[in-house]
Structures are given as structure tokens and as C-alpha cells.
Amino acid sequence: MAEMKKTIDNKPAPKGEKKANRRGAARLAAVQALYQMDVGGAGLNDIFAEFESHWLGNEVEGDQYLPAEQAFFQDVVSGVVRDQAKLDPLIDVALAKGWPLARIDAILRAVMRAGAYELEHRKDVPARVVVSEYVDVANAFVEGEETGMVNAVLDQIARQFRADEFSRG
């Protein structure tokens, strides 16, 4: 018998719910988790436990959080933590001169780190989709020029890691 995909709250995904919606929720959750780790100093295991038991698929402070694809969420968060020393210089190079990653708001650092990780390691997701999804995530937190910066940085990184996708048109 095929194993049913589980959401981040370990409940089966509703039949009408699309994989893309669960992945989008996982991306948003990953960015929130990375932000919390960055500003609050929380550890990976604590973050996983908190998000899996209290946030996703639940109502928190009046907001209903969507179920998320647990494996995808964990992959992005743990991958960014593992590869951050490699990802940060890539993002720094893609940022405009005079704007090192350390000067960028913590939530945008989390967005760009997650996007850069996914571009490098999640070849199952087209690069343009990754960039678009993380621009959408950024839009949940900031407006205007900041989302343009996220788009430009991730597009540059995408062309570095996935040049073949862009050469095909």
C-alpha cells in the first residue's frame, strides 16, 4: 500500500489540496523558522518541535496556518543551517555593492538563504518556480523594493546553479 503524504502536523493532506500549496506553506514556514533561529538563537531541534506541534495547520494569534509538506520544510531548514557558510557568500556576491548580507533585514536574509538553498539542492523544482515562490514569500513580509531585491538576487543565483534551464528559454 502506498504511503500517504503527511502534512507538517502529521495529518494526511486533504484530497483536494495541491502539492504546490503544501510546498508553498512549507517555504513560508521555513522562512519563519530560519528568521526565528537568526534573531532568537533557537536550535534546529527546538524549531522543528515548535513548528510541527504549535504552528502549522493550527490557528496562532488569530491566523490560520496551512498544512505544509513536512519533509520539504525540514529539508529546507536543515539544509540552510548546514550550508549557510556556503550560501551567505553567494548571496553577498549577488547583492548590490555596499549592501552586504549582514545589513539586510533578518526576514529577507531568511528568504534569500532558503531560496538559494532550494536553487542549489532541489533540482526537482524548476528555478523560475523557486524564484517566484520566494518572491511571494517575501511579499508576505515586505513591500516594494525589497521584493525586487529578492527577485534579482535569486535570479542571479538561479542562473549560476541552473544555467541550463535559462538557456532552454
UniProtKB/Swiss-Prot annotation:
Protein name stated in the entry: Transcription antitermination protein NusB
UniProt-annotated stretches for the region Disordered: 1-22
NCBIfam families attached to this UniProt entry: nusB
Chain intervals with Basic and acidic residues compositional bias: 1-19
Family matches, as Gene3D superfamilies: NusB-like (1.10.940.10)
UniProt keyword annotations, A-Z: RNA-binding, Transcription, Transcription antitermination, Transcription regulation
Summary of the function given for this chain in its UniProt record: Involved in transcription antitermination. Required for transcription of ribosomal RNA (rRNA) genes. Binds specifically to the boxA antiterminator sequence of the ribosomal RNA (rrn) operons.
Organism in which the protein naturally occurs: Rhodopseudomonas palustris (strain BisB18)
Ribosomal protein found in the keyword field: no
InterPro entries in alphabetical order: NusB-like_sf, NusB_fam, NusB_RsmB_TIM44
Gene Ontology CC terms, in alphabetical order: cytosol
Superkingdom to which the source organism belongs: Bacteria
Assigned protein family: Belongs to the NusB family.
Origin organism lineage: Bacteria, Pseudomonadati, Pseudomonadota, Alphaproteobacteria, Hyphomicrobiales
One annotated GO molecular function: RNA binding
GO process terms (BP): DNA-templated transcription termination; transcription antitermination
